[in-house]
Amino acid sequence: MSRVVVIGGGPAGMFAAIAAAENGHHVTLLEKNEKLGKKLFITGKGRCNITNSSDMDVLFNSVMTNRKFLYSAFYAYDNQMVIDFFEQAGLPVKNERGNRIFPVSDHSSDVIAALQRVLKKDQVEIRLHSEEIGRAHV
């Protein structure tokens, strides 16, 4: 088992840590703030627009100007997989106007709690207040 260090406890960092842990790695997640997902708390006016349920081709044609750049990433882990991930993590979601996906509770804190449950289940080591990052700290 190799050791993986993920720097940053935002949504991308938490997902990266989960993916690495679920692929058999010992993962340490470093976050400079006092809690994970700090900026996520304020997204969507505190509700957290998780994803969009539109067909991927519709999304690419209406939003993206450089479709080729993100095409493979979006199809490797699509919006339905994001919805499934959160529902399996115990977070029920709802589809609102414009195909926007929100937690049923309308609280971004529930999105963060769902991610933290998965991090804990996957035994990811979390180090908060880790602003200075160097080899000696890992």
Where are the language model's segments positioned?
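Residue-level detector of alpha-helical segments with a strong bias toward transmembrane helices
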Residues: 23, 54-56, 133
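Conserved N-terminal/central alpha/beta ligand/cofactor-binding core
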Residues: 32-125
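A conserved short coil-to-beta-strand element within the FAD-binding core of flavoproteins
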Residues: 128-135
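Phosphate-coordination loops involved in phosphoryl transfer and adenosine-cofactor binding
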Residues: 1, 96, 129
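N-terminal Rossmann-like FAD-binding beta1-loop-alpha1 element of flavoenzymes
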Residues: 2-29
